[in-house]
Amino acid sequence: IDHPFDQAFEQVVALVKERGWEVIAVSPQEGRIEATDTTLIMGFKDDVVIRVQGVGSRTRIDVRSVSRVGKSDLGVNAKRIRLFLAELKDSRE
């Protein structure tokens, strides 16, 4: 994204909190945010890790979401990532 690291990191942390995810760890030094999202239907806990890396005057954001239980997540984790990145993009505009 076209924002410096500090600004992007703050936006990511704010969006994680806005989405109601449980924040487990925030480390600006490592550029890492760890959180847990609980599914609405069954109450399953899914782990989310977001890496924020400064690249010159821009920032790269990587998101990983994984279910703790079950063999298939029925696309929930991919959808969570897509929605998060779309909301992050909208919050910057």
Summary of predicted features, one role per range:
Residues 1-93:
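Ser/Thr-rich, low-complexity intrinsically disordered terminal regions
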